[in-house]
């Protein structure tokens, strides 16, 4: 009788598995491994994912975008922890979401701390609302500016803030908070300084690149005055680290100089009129006032420039031509101001900027 004896290897091949893997059930290649899907998770799981989705689709243009995003992620992580603990009993899911929750809570707390209302001293609130707030300086940045390297000082009526040819211009920059100051040159009255105005802005601008200069005018308190005073050197270093605030100061000082020059043209201006002087003057008027200021600051020892100015101009729009005999002082650099526009305060300077140059 003829018969063929089958080998164990052939039998193993016929049934589709090897002897070592005899316990594994073969899976056809045309079927998925997920034959039985699990049931839908609890509602808490889906609500958590809804909060995640809301946080991710929040537009970045919202003012509180980051706070809302962190808030949504915090709620989502909390619901995930509840779901993993009560309905899934998954320790690893609970631990990971606890870590994520802690990170989001810390970041959310930091964002809320930054958004806290900053309290500005009552005495400084006036200059903030008048000068800095319209230029969108944040309250916290203003508080940093006024909380360091500056102090509030007092002058009684008749006391001098600066004396011509005696007081150095390198020490400080000040804004008048209360009272009124009178500016004179060799006994001749020039103009008044009112609250929320810089006291020594022309000297600050004209001597930025020079050291050891002296005031060319005398500034005396006409009332009991209080003023905010910065150390000039430390203020300069601070503004170098804050480019935005540097541009703000550059604009404010330039505009303050313009107002002072306008006061030179019309000494009868009072505080209320100065407050209304927010519109830009014509080019002709600004050039006229800059020439007049240079005639005072950069005059020689003779008083020709002062007397010529005191004789005045018939119109604020008439251009003042300095005397050909006038010489620039070696001590004070003439003020050269470009014509600025409120809408282009923070625009880069163009090569076509108008400047006033002293005639030889």
UniProtKB/Swiss-Prot annotation:
<dbReference type="GO" id="GO:0030552">
    <property type="term" value="F:cAMP binding"/>
</dbReference>
<keyword id="KW-0796">Tight junction</keyword>
<dbReference type="GO" id="GO:0007507">
    <property type="term" value="P:heart development"/>
</dbReference>
<dbReference type="InterPro" id="IPR055272">
    <property type="entry name" value="POPDC1-3_dom"/>
</dbReference>
<feature type="topological domain" description="Extracellular">
    <location>
        <position position="92"/>
    </location>
</feature>
<dbReference type="InterPro" id="IPR018490">
    <property type="entry name" value="cNMP-bd_dom_sf"/>
</dbReference>
<feature type="modified residue" description="Phosphoserine">
    <location>
        <position position="295"/>
    </location>
</feature>
<keyword id="KW-0217">Developmental protein</keyword>
<feature type="compositionally biased region" description="Acidic residues">
    <location>
        <begin position="337"/>
        <end position="347"/>
    </location>
</feature>
<keyword id="KW-0812">Transmembrane</keyword>
<feature type="transmembrane region" description="Helical">
    <location>
        <begin position="49"/>
        <end position="69"/>
    </location>
</feature>
<dbReference type="GO" id="GO:0001921">
    <property type="term" value="P:positive regulation of receptor recycling"/>
</dbReference>
<comment type="similarity">
    <text>Belongs to the popeye family.</text>
</comment>
<keyword id="KW-0130">Cell adhesion</keyword>
<dbReference type="GO" id="GO:0016192">
    <property type="term" value="P:vesicle-mediated transport"/>
</dbReference>
<dbReference type="GO" id="GO:0090136">
    <property type="term" value="P:epithelial cell-cell adhesion"/>
</dbReference>
<feature type="transmembrane region" description="Helical">
    <location>
        <begin position="71"/>
        <end position="91"/>
    </location>
</feature>
<dbReference type="GO" id="GO:0042391">
    <property type="term" value="P:regulation of membrane potential"/>
</dbReference>
<dbReference type="GO" id="GO:0002931">
    <property type="term" value="P:response to ischemia"/>
</dbReference>
<dbReference type="GO" id="GO:0005923">
    <property type="term" value="C:bicellular tight junction"/>
</dbReference>
<feature type="glycosylation site" description="N-linked (GlcNAc...) asparagine">
    <location>
        <position position="30"/>
    </location>
</feature>
<keyword id="KW-0114">cAMP</keyword>
<comment type="subunit">
    <text>Homodimer. Homodimerization requires the C-terminus cytoplasmic region. Interacts (via the C-terminus cytoplasmic tail) with TJP1. Interacts (via the C-terminus cytoplasmic tail) with ARHGEF25/GEFT (via the DH domain). Interacts (via the C-terminus cytoplasmic tail) with VAMP3. Interacts with KCNK2; the interaction enhances KCNK2 surface expression. Interacts with CAV3.</text>
</comment>
<feature type="compositionally biased region" description="Polar residues">
    <location>
        <begin position="350"/>
        <end position="360"/>
    </location>
</feature>
<keyword id="KW-0597">Phosphoprotein</keyword>
<feature type="region of interest" description="Disordered">
    <location>
        <begin position="325"/>
        <end position="360"/>
    </location>
</feature>
<feature type="region of interest" description="Required for interaction with KCNK2">
    <location>
        <begin position="136"/>
        <end position="186"/>
    </location>
</feature>
<dbReference type="GO" id="GO:0016020">
    <property type="term" value="C:membrane"/>
</dbReference>
<feature type="topological domain" description="Cytoplasmic">
    <location>
        <begin position="114"/>
        <end position="360"/>
    </location>
</feature>
<feature type="topological domain" description="Extracellular">
    <location>
        <begin position="1"/>
        <end position="48"/>
    </location>
</feature>
<protein>
    <recommendedName>
        <fullName>Popeye domain-containing protein 1</fullName>
    </recommendedName>
</protein>
<keyword id="KW-0965">Cell junction</keyword>
<dbReference type="InterPro" id="IPR006916">
    <property type="entry name" value="POPDC1-3"/>
</dbReference>
<keyword id="KW-1133">Transmembrane helix</keyword>
<feature type="transmembrane region" description="Helical">
    <location>
        <begin position="93"/>
        <end position="113"/>
    </location>
</feature>
<dbReference type="GO" id="GO:0034446">
    <property type="term" value="P:substrate adhesion-dependent cell spreading"/>
</dbReference>
<dbReference type="GO" id="GO:0042383">
    <property type="term" value="C:sarcolemma"/>
</dbReference>
<keyword id="KW-0325">Glycoprotein</keyword>
<dbReference type="GO" id="GO:0040017">
    <property type="term" value="P:positive regulation of locomotion"/>
</dbReference>
<dbReference type="Pfam" id="PF04831">
    <property type="entry name" value="POPDC1-3"/>
</dbReference>
<dbReference type="GO" id="GO:0008360">
    <property type="term" value="P:regulation of cell shape"/>
</dbReference>
<keyword id="KW-1003">Cell membrane</keyword>
């Amino acid at each position: 009788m003829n018969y063929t004896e089958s080998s164990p290897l052939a039998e193993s091949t016929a049934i589709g598995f090897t002897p070592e893997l005899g316990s594994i059930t073969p899976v056809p290649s045309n079927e998925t491994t997920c034959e039985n899907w699990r049931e839908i998770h609890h509602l808490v799981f889906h609500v958590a994912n809804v909060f995640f989705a809301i946080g991710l689709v929040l537009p970045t243009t919202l003012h509180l975008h980051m706070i809302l995003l962190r808030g949504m992620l915090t709620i989502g992580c909390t619901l995930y922890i509840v779901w993993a603990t009560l309905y899934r009993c998954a320790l690893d899911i609970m631990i990971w979401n606890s870590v994520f929750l802690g990170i989001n809570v810390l970041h959310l707390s930091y964002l809320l701390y930054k958004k806290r209302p900053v309290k500005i001293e009552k005495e400084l609130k006036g200059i903030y609302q008048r000068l800095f707030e319209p230029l969108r300086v944040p309250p916290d940045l203003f508080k940093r500016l006024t909380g360091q390297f500056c102090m509030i000082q007092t002058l009684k009526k008749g006391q001098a803030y600066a004396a011509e040819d005696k007081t150095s211009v390198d020490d400080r920059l000040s804004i008048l908070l209360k009272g009124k100051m009178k500016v004179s040159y060799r006994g001749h009255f020039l103009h008044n300084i009112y609250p929320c105005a810089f006291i020594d802005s022309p000297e600050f601008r004209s001597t930025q690149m020079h050291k050891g200069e002296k005031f060319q005018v005398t500034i005396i308190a006409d009332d009991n005055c209080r003023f905010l005073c910065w150390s000039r050197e430390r203020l300069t270093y601070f503004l170098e680290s804050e480019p935005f605030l540097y541009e703000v100061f550059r604009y404010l000082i330039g505009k303050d100089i313009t107002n002072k020059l306008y006061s030179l043209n019309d000494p009868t201006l009072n505080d209320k009129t100065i407050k209304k002087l927010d519109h830009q003057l014509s080019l002709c008027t600004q050039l006229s006032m800059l020439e007049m200021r240079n005639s005072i600051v950069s005059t020689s020892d003779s008083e020709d420039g002062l007397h010529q100015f005191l004789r005045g101009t018939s119109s604020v729009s008439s251009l003042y031509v300095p005397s050909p005999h006038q010489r620039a002082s070696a001590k004070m650099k003439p003020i050269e101001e470009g014509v600025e526009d409120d809408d282009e305060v923070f625009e880069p300077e163009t090569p076509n900027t108008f400047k006033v140059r002293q005639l030889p």
